[in-house]
Amino acid sequence: MDRPICPPKIAIIGAGIGGLALAIGLTRRNVDYTIYEAGSQFSAVGAGIALGPNSLRAMTLIDPRLMELYKGISRGNRSPEKAHIFADFMLAEPGFGINSGWEGAPVGSKDFTKSGAHRKDLLDIMTRLFPTENVRFGKRAVEVRQAGQKVVIQFADGEAVEVDAVIGCDGAKGATRRAVLTENYPDHVAARYSGRYVYRVVIPATEAQQALGAYADDGKMFLGPGHYFALYQMSGGRLNLVAGRQKNDEWTHDQWTQDVTREEMLADFKGCDPRLIELLGVSIPYISLWLETEIVIS
Protein backbone atom coordinates (compact mmCIF):
# COMPACT_ATOMS: atom_id res chain seq x y z
CA MET A 1 0.00 0.00 0.00
CA ASP A 2 1.40 3.37 -1.01
CA ARG A 3 2.12 5.88 1.71
CA PRO A 4 0.04 9.04 1.51
CA ILE A 5 2.03 11.99 0.22
CA CYS A 6 2.26 14.69 2.86
CA PRO A 7 2.18 18.24 1.52
CA PRO A 8 5.33 20.24 2.27
CA LYS A 9 5.36 22.62 5.21
CA ILE A 10 6.36 26.04 3.88
CA ALA A 11 7.27 29.02 6.04
CA ILE A 12 7.30 32.62 4.87
CA ILE A 13 9.24 34.93 7.17
CA GLY A 14 7.93 38.49 6.96
CA ALA A 15 4.48 39.91 6.21
CA GLY A 16 5.52 42.88 4.11
CA ILE A 17 4.67 43.37 0.46
CA GLY A 18 6.99 40.57 -0.67
CA GLY A 19 5.68 38.07 1.85
CA LEU A 20 2.04 38.86 1.14
CA ALA A 21 2.54 38.70 -2.63
CA LEU A 22 4.03 35.24 -2.20
CA ALA A 23 1.14 34.21 0.06
CA ILE A 24 -1.38 35.33 -2.56
CA GLY A 25 0.39 33.34 -5.27
CA LEU A 26 0.60 30.19 -3.14
CA THR A 27 -3.05 30.52 -2.10
CA ARG A 28 -4.16 30.73 -5.71
CA ARG A 29 -2.22 27.52 -6.42
CA ASN A 30 -3.56 25.70 -3.34
CA VAL A 31 -0.17 25.45 -1.63
CA ASP A 32 -0.28 25.48 2.17
CA TYR A 33 2.02 27.83 4.12
CA THR A 34 2.43 29.83 7.32
CA ILE A 35 3.64 33.43 7.52
CA TYR A 36 5.70 34.39 10.57
CA GLU A 37 5.69 38.13 11.25
CA ALA A 38 7.68 39.89 13.98
CA GLY A 39 5.15 42.69 14.42
CA SER A 40 1.85 42.48 16.26
CA GLN A 41 -0.11 43.35 13.11
CA PHE A 42 0.35 44.20 9.45
CA SER A 43 2.61 47.24 9.39
CA ALA A 44 1.34 50.63 8.26
CA VAL A 45 4.87 52.06 8.24
CA GLY A 46 5.98 53.44 4.91
CA ALA A 47 5.10 56.01 2.32
CA GLY A 48 4.40 55.93 -1.39
CA ILE A 49 5.34 53.16 -3.79
CA ALA A 50 5.69 53.67 -7.53
CA LEU A 51 5.49 50.43 -9.49
CA GLY A 52 7.36 49.80 -12.72
CA PRO A 53 6.32 47.57 -15.62
CA ASN A 54 7.87 44.40 -14.20
CA SER A 55 6.01 44.79 -10.90
CA LEU A 56 2.73 45.43 -12.68
CA ARG A 57 3.14 42.35 -14.87
CA ALA A 58 4.05 40.31 -11.80
CA MET A 59 0.79 41.34 -10.10
CA THR A 60 -1.26 39.81 -12.88
CA LEU A 61 0.82 36.63 -12.90
CA ILE A 62 0.49 36.25 -9.11
CA ASP A 63 -3.28 36.74 -9.17
CA PRO A 64 -5.28 38.83 -11.68
CA ARG A 65 -7.52 39.96 -8.81
CA LEU A 66 -4.55 41.71 -7.24
CA MET A 67 -4.11 43.87 -10.31
CA GLU A 68 -7.82 44.72 -10.38
CA LEU A 69 -7.77 45.77 -6.72
CA TYR A 70 -4.59 47.77 -7.26
CA LYS A 71 -6.23 49.72 -10.07
CA GLY A 72 -8.83 50.85 -7.55
CA ILE A 73 -6.31 52.45 -5.18
CA SER A 74 -3.52 53.59 -7.49
CA ARG A 75 -3.11 56.97 -9.12
CA GLY A 76 -1.14 57.94 -12.19
CA ASN A 77 -0.05 61.12 -13.87
CA ARG A 78 -2.82 63.70 -14.08
CA SER A 79 -2.02 64.78 -17.65
CA PRO A 80 -3.58 62.29 -20.11
CA GLU A 81 -0.75 62.77 -22.59
CA LYS A 82 1.73 61.68 -19.90
CA ALA A 83 -0.07 58.48 -18.86
CA HIS A 84 2.83 56.36 -20.13
CA ILE A 85 5.62 58.56 -18.72
CA PHE A 86 7.44 57.27 -15.65
CA ALA A 87 8.85 60.73 -14.91
CA ASP A 88 9.95 63.96 -16.51
CA PHE A 89 13.64 64.30 -15.69
CA MET A 90 14.55 67.92 -14.99
CA LEU A 91 17.29 69.84 -13.24
CA ALA A 92 16.92 70.84 -9.60
CA GLU A 93 18.69 74.15 -10.18
CA PRO A 94 16.70 77.42 -10.20
CA GLY A 95 14.45 77.39 -13.25
CA PHE A 96 14.52 73.58 -13.48
CA GLY A 97 17.08 73.81 -16.26
CA ILE A 98 15.02 76.01 -18.56
CA ASN A 99 17.35 78.96 -17.90
CA SER A 100 20.21 76.75 -19.07
CA GLY A 101 18.45 75.77 -22.27
CA TRP A 102 17.45 72.27 -21.13
CA GLU A 103 13.76 71.69 -20.48
CA GLY A 104 14.00 68.10 -19.33
CA ALA A 105 13.36 64.68 -20.83
CA PRO A 106 10.37 62.37 -20.37
CA VAL A 107 11.20 58.73 -19.66
CA GLY A 108 8.57 56.08 -20.28
CA SER A 109 7.09 53.62 -22.75
CA LYS A 110 3.81 53.10 -24.57
CA ASP A 111 3.69 49.64 -22.96
CA PHE A 112 3.75 51.09 -19.45
CA THR A 113 1.19 53.13 -17.50
CA LYS A 114 2.57 55.09 -14.56
CA SER A 115 0.94 54.42 -11.20
CA GLY A 116 1.63 54.71 -7.50
CA ALA A 117 -0.06 53.99 -4.18
CA HIS A 118 0.49 54.29 -0.47
CA ARG A 119 2.12 51.23 1.06
CA LYS A 120 -0.66 50.81 3.63
CA ASP A 121 -3.35 50.94 0.96
CA LEU A 122 -1.49 48.28 -1.02
CA LEU A 123 -1.14 46.03 2.03
CA ASP A 124 -4.84 46.46 2.80
CA ILE A 125 -5.95 45.11 -0.57
CA MET A 126 -3.40 42.30 -0.46
CA THR A 127 -4.83 40.97 2.81
CA ARG A 128 -8.15 40.33 1.04
CA LEU A 129 -6.63 37.67 -1.19
CA PHE A 130 -5.35 35.07 1.25
CA PRO A 131 -6.53 33.59 4.57
CA THR A 132 -5.10 35.87 7.25
CA GLU A 133 -5.34 33.03 9.77
CA ASN A 134 -2.20 31.74 8.03
CA VAL A 135 -0.26 34.60 9.66
CA ARG A 136 1.33 34.25 13.10
CA PHE A 137 2.15 37.65 14.54
CA GLY A 138 4.72 38.36 17.23
CA LYS A 139 7.12 35.77 15.80
CA ARG A 140 10.56 37.32 15.34
CA ALA A 141 12.91 34.83 13.68
CA VAL A 142 16.40 34.98 15.19
CA GLU A 143 17.94 31.96 13.46
CA VAL A 144 17.29 29.83 10.39
CA ARG A 145 19.35 26.64 10.05
CA GLN A 146 19.43 23.51 7.94
CA ALA A 147 18.69 20.29 9.82
CA GLY A 148 19.13 17.39 7.42
CA GLN A 149 16.32 17.60 4.88
CA LYS A 150 14.40 20.05 7.05
CA VAL A 151 14.84 23.68 8.08
CA VAL A 152 14.50 24.88 11.67
CA ILE A 153 13.38 28.41 12.52
CA GLN A 154 14.21 29.66 15.99
CA PHE A 155 12.10 32.52 17.31
CA ALA A 156 12.90 35.16 19.90
CA ASP A 157 10.13 33.86 22.19
CA GLY A 158 11.89 30.49 22.47
CA GLU A 159 9.69 28.52 20.08
CA ALA A 160 11.31 26.55 17.25
CA VAL A 161 9.48 25.14 14.23
CA GLU A 162 10.65 22.61 11.66
CA VAL A 163 9.56 23.03 8.06
CA ASP A 164 10.42 21.74 4.60
CA ALA A 165 11.22 25.12 3.09
CA VAL A 166 11.73 28.71 4.23
CA ILE A 167 11.22 31.75 2.02
CA GLY A 168 12.72 34.83 3.59
CA CYS A 169 10.93 38.15 3.12
CA ASP A 170 12.41 39.64 6.27
CA GLY A 171 14.67 42.32 4.82
CA ALA A 172 18.31 43.29 5.14
CA LYS A 173 18.42 42.72 8.90
CA GLY A 174 16.57 39.41 8.79
CA ALA A 175 17.63 35.97 9.95
CA THR A 176 17.22 34.54 6.46
CA ARG A 177 19.95 36.74 5.04
CA ARG A 178 22.37 35.55 7.72
CA ALA A 179 21.47 31.92 7.02
CA VAL A 180 22.08 32.25 3.29
CA LEU A 181 25.26 34.35 3.30
CA THR A 182 27.20 33.72 6.51
CA GLU A 183 29.09 30.60 5.41
CA ASN A 184 30.26 31.67 1.95
CA TYR A 185 29.86 35.46 1.95
CA PRO A 186 30.32 36.64 5.55
CA ASP A 187 31.38 40.12 4.45
CA HIS A 188 28.02 40.64 2.77
CA VAL A 189 25.76 39.76 5.70
CA ALA A 190 25.60 43.24 7.23
CA ALA A 191 23.96 46.02 5.24
CA ARG A 192 26.47 48.54 3.96
CA TYR A 193 25.70 52.23 3.74
CA SER A 194 25.74 53.43 0.13
CA GLY A 195 26.69 57.00 0.99
CA ARG A 196 23.17 58.21 0.24
CA TYR A 197 20.34 59.16 2.57
CA VAL A 198 16.85 60.38 1.80
CA TYR A 199 14.07 62.43 3.30
CA ARG A 200 10.64 61.11 2.44
CA VAL A 201 7.14 62.38 3.07
CA VAL A 202 3.55 62.16 1.89
CA ILE A 203 2.19 65.58 0.87
CA PRO A 204 -1.43 66.61 0.11
CA ALA A 205 -1.81 67.35 -3.58
CA THR A 206 -3.10 70.87 -2.89
CA GLU A 207 0.08 71.81 -1.02
CA ALA A 208 2.29 70.33 -3.72
CA GLN A 209 0.44 72.31 -6.37
CA GLN A 210 0.76 75.50 -4.34
CA ALA A 211 4.53 75.04 -4.30
CA LEU A 212 5.10 73.65 -7.81
CA GLY A 213 2.03 74.51 -9.85
CA ALA A 214 1.58 72.27 -12.90
CA TYR A 215 4.92 70.58 -12.20
CA ALA A 216 3.11 68.63 -9.46
CA ASP A 217 0.60 67.11 -11.89
CA ASP A 218 2.86 64.32 -13.13
CA GLY A 219 5.84 62.24 -12.03
CA LYS A 220 9.05 64.25 -11.76
CA MET A 221 12.72 63.66 -11.08
CA PHE A 222 14.67 66.84 -10.31
CA LEU A 223 18.41 66.15 -10.49
CA GLY A 224 21.49 68.01 -9.33
CA PRO A 225 25.07 67.32 -8.25
CA GLY A 226 24.80 65.05 -5.22
CA HIS A 227 21.04 65.42 -4.77
CA TYR A 228 17.68 64.63 -6.32
CA PHE A 229 13.93 65.00 -5.73
CA ALA A 230 11.41 62.34 -6.79
CA LEU A 231 7.73 63.28 -6.82
CA TYR A 232 4.73 61.24 -7.96
CA GLN A 233 1.00 60.77 -7.46
CA MET A 234 -0.35 58.12 -5.11
CA SER A 235 -3.65 57.03 -3.57
CA GLY A 236 -5.85 59.33 -1.54
CA GLY A 237 -5.13 62.55 -3.43
CA ARG A 238 -1.57 62.68 -2.10
CA LEU A 239 1.92 62.85 -3.52
CA ASN A 240 5.03 61.04 -2.42
CA LEU A 241 8.21 63.09 -2.13
CA VAL A 242 11.67 61.59 -1.78
CA ALA A 243 14.58 64.02 -1.49
CA GLY A 244 17.95 62.27 -1.69
CA ARG A 245 21.46 63.38 -0.82
CA GLN A 246 24.63 61.59 -1.95
CA LYS A 247 27.61 62.38 0.30
CA ASN A 248 29.69 59.18 0.20
CA ASP A 249 30.55 59.51 3.87
CA GLU A 250 30.11 57.14 6.80
CA TRP A 251 26.83 56.50 8.61
CA THR A 252 27.76 56.90 12.27
CA HIS A 253 24.31 56.50 13.83
CA ASP A 254 23.01 53.33 15.49
CA GLN A 255 19.60 53.47 13.80
CA TRP A 256 18.70 53.52 10.12
CA THR A 257 16.68 56.69 10.63
CA GLN A 258 17.85 59.91 12.20
CA ASP A 259 16.12 63.04 13.47
CA VAL A 260 17.45 66.27 11.96
CA THR A 261 16.53 69.91 12.28
CA ARG A 262 14.72 71.87 9.62
CA GLU A 263 17.87 73.92 9.07
CA GLU A 264 20.00 70.82 8.55
CA MET A 265 17.56 69.42 6.02
CA LEU A 266 17.24 72.62 4.00
CA ALA A 267 21.03 73.07 4.02
CA ASP A 268 21.34 69.74 2.22
CA PHE A 269 19.60 71.27 -0.79
CA LYS A 270 21.09 74.74 -0.81
CA GLY A 271 21.10 76.21 -4.31
CA CYS A 272 18.12 74.22 -5.59
CA ASP A 273 15.06 75.87 -7.11
CA PRO A 274 13.14 77.80 -4.40
CA ARG A 275 9.97 75.90 -5.28
CA LEU A 276 11.61 72.65 -4.23
CA ILE A 277 12.78 74.25 -1.00
CA GLU A 278 9.23 75.45 -0.40
CA LEU A 279 7.94 71.93 -0.99
CA LEU A 280 10.36 70.61 1.62
CA GLY A 281 9.22 73.35 3.96
CA VAL A 282 5.54 72.38 3.85
CA SER A 283 6.49 68.82 4.76
CA ILE A 284 7.75 69.79 8.22
CA PRO A 285 7.27 68.21 10.76
CA TYR A 286 6.33 65.03 8.92
CA ILE A 287 9.61 64.28 7.18
CA SER A 288 12.19 61.69 8.20
CA LEU A 289 15.73 60.96 7.12
CA TRP A 290 16.44 57.39 6.02
CA LEU A 291 19.72 55.86 4.96
CA GLU A 292 20.00 53.85 1.75
CA THR A 293 22.03 50.65 1.64
CA GLU A 294 23.55 48.61 -1.14
CA ILE A 295 21.07 45.83 -0.42
CA VAL A 296 17.71 45.12 -1.99
CA ILE A 297 15.77 42.27 -0.39
CA SER A 298 12.16 41.20 -0.59
Predicted regions and their residues:
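Conserved Rossmann-like nucleotide-cofactor binding loop
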Residues: G18, Q41, K173
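A generic "structured core" feature
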Residues: I10-I12, L20-L22, R29, A141
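FAD-binding beta-loop-beta segment adjacent to the flavin cofactor pocket
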Residues: L291-S298
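Active-site-adjacent segment of FAD-dependent monooxygenases/related oxidoreductases
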Residues: G46-L129
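Residues at the starts of beta-strands that form the adenosine-phosphate
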Residues: K9, D32, R238
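Conserved FAD-binding catalytic core of PHBH/FMO-like flavoproteins
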Residues: L66-M67, D111-I284
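Beta1/beta-strand and adjacent pyrophosphate-binding region of the FAD-binding site
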Residues: D2-G18
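Glycine-rich FAD pyrophosphate-binding loop
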Residues: T27-A47
